[in-house]
């Protein structure tokens, strides 16, 4: 029986990629800089203190993968851990450093075209676009129209939104159109309908995602984004390994978290919504228990990115990594003889880096299974090596990109 479990630690880069200069990200290192801050005692909070402690990930080769990526061992990680898995680091072939590009490339389909972007920091959106969205949604106006941090924009405009009923439109360095609305005063269903309208109107702009950003709270300083986020993505430009598994083997792909949204539902046969790392872990375990032959269980742990990377919260990121590491054996112990477990990321988001955007980094590729030989996989030229490996593992037709590391 063949089953693959893929865990994406969203934004957990392990060192600047070779083309980081194009993105202004030379020297970025999500893992290394978190470890450095922890080692210096600068990432202590109520949940953690001291050096970054990731014994289980280190046994899978994380520390060594980071060393191969950057040339140095991340501070505090165990250089002498007995390696029980295959480890490597992968460069991104895709043109961007965004979530869809990273995930699609993992599934064997790199993004070789350029996304559309709203580059202007202020007055970011064309008037003809927003006019059409407002007319179709029967709205009198909107707020924002700028690049913004998702939490700061709520403090800046949340109260006005509640008073006027006008949605908050904003973007970032990614190919995104984001809409924030209060779940109670505006309504979640109304927000999702508005986002669908925006998705349709953005067809000619080649924007990767429309993101619904619902929030709650009574006023400034009290607003919180909820777990009802929704990503409306374009479909991948070619068939992914997920779709091939379903079509060629009558297989199953169980999405946990936002995976289904990222692939616009393509190749997904079952989806489970869960919010927060603990709930995502629980849902993943339940899915593994129920998984049959020719199944992929695919989980995205978005909080590393959304709650800690973008928020530049080093201590929070470190605590979340240590929690993840502590629970990882629960999944490892569930693996049957022929199963494989792959841990990876989709891009970087260095919480010590200027700004609030993603960083162009290598991603870890950690592979574990009873039949997986331990040792280095080296530098992989594309994230698509993961997709090609899955194609070989499940004995389906080859992907166009990538080389298997099995």
UniProtKB/Swiss-Prot annotation:
GO molecular function: magnesium ion binding; manganese ion binding; phosphopentomutase activity
Keyword Zinc part of the UniProt annotation: no
Catalytic activity field: 2-deoxy-alpha-D-ribose 1-phosphate = 2-deoxy-D-ribose 5-phosphate; alpha-D-ribose 1-phosphate = D-ribose 5-phosphate
Protein residues bound to Mn(2+) 2: 305, 310, 358
Binding site for Mn(2+) 1: 10, 346-347
Compartments in which it is found: Cytoplasm
InterPro entries assigned: Alkaline_phosphatase_core_sf (IPR017850), DeoB (IPR010045), Metalloenzyme (IPR006124), Phosphopentomutase_DeoB_cap_sf (IPR024052)
Cellular component GO terms held in the UniProt record: cytosol
Pfam families: Metalloenzyme (PF01676)
Keyword tags: Cytoplasm, Isomerase, Manganese, Metal-binding
Taxonomy, superkingdom: Bacteria
Gene3D superfamilies named in the record: Alkaline Phosphatase, subunit A (3.40.720.10), Phosphopentomutase (3.30.70.1250)
Cofactor, how bound (note): Binds 2 manganese ions.
PANTHER family found in the cross-reference section: PHOSPHOPENTOMUTASE (PTHR21110:SF0)
UniProt-listed HAMAP family: Phosphopentomut
Job of this protein: Isomerase that catalyzes the conversion of deoxy-ribose 1-phosphate (dRib-1-P) and ribose 1-phosphate (Rib-1-P) to deoxy-ribose 5-phosphate (dRib-5-P) and ribose 5-phosphate (Rib-5-P), respectively.
Protein name: Phosphopentomutase
Encoding gene (name): deoB
